[in-house]
């Protein structure tokens, strides 16, 4: 009887891998011994030594995703710098169109803030040496797009109608089933796990997606689709509160309001929507486990590589240090109050929200964390300050007649006028501003800090400039 021995080393950095390979004690815990007979007769000759049972059976007996959808390569421009730009600089130019560019880990909806110099049927790219126009006839019938970089896992989102997809954000045409069911399957931890059994590469090709095993019945299942649809809706709502997104929609209340309550309300919306999305994502995983007929051993193998669903974590927050969490939160958020997608400290698949990240970091229930952050919000000084600065940024742009990145025109106003208008908006402005900003005045914040907040939020391509005591909104 012959056996094969494998050492499973999946740590992210080369340095960690080297340390493990040089340490006999650490290496022995990663040894996987497999009978050679397991690989005899495998239909695709793959050495999936790490999986057996239900997972191995899924690769043999399940339908392939390519039977139900067509993952496709996107167009290559040949000159990214000349042909791709942010949408707020090109919104009124008819030669430019919205594009799915990839851009990192992003599930369900989003990454719609880029544009491509397209013209008629890609005429500008066609004329560029080194470019490659692909699947032009599929643009108007393609409903999904994904990020081709799979470092954090597979992430798929809705493609907007008529949106161009390029090589870093390839498209998926649905042939059979419900689009939200497709999204639910592809954005699951299980799909990422299965994909990693097919390829160790960090770049996800269309061919590997097509080879994914899939429980066919779920792709047309109404309840499964509803879970995916709910995730899209909640992610879209979250995107609509972030100013750099084309989905941004901000309605100011009439009359005066409380600045303290406004900040708390914005934080609560983001946390509540994320918590609800995590619940639906957990339901998706549960339905897939049942559909694939995975047993406890299969689930443990999957979770050892992808981590558990954040919603399933049950740890409490009894010993949490608010100041420590507050400092972590500040590092995890952009100047615009958006979470920076990343792999959490104790997870091996990327996450998209603050609650999910903190849940993995502290092995705590996201429900407990949500309650901690909202009920003890006054203790989270840095957290509130990020949201205050984001709110002030929105107020300034709104006063300059900015409504969204696709709905704005050039304008200007004096700092004095802006300061007066903002102060009049909130009944408790002086007290809350001083509490979070210290001795800095609003005039000083606009002069010294707002430019940095704006530049960072708008990805280094600002439309707001300061000239002396005047703020300008312009495309130049």
Question: Can you name each region flagged by the protein language model?
Answer:
Residues 126-131, 139-141, 162-175, 205-219, ...:
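Glycine- and acidic
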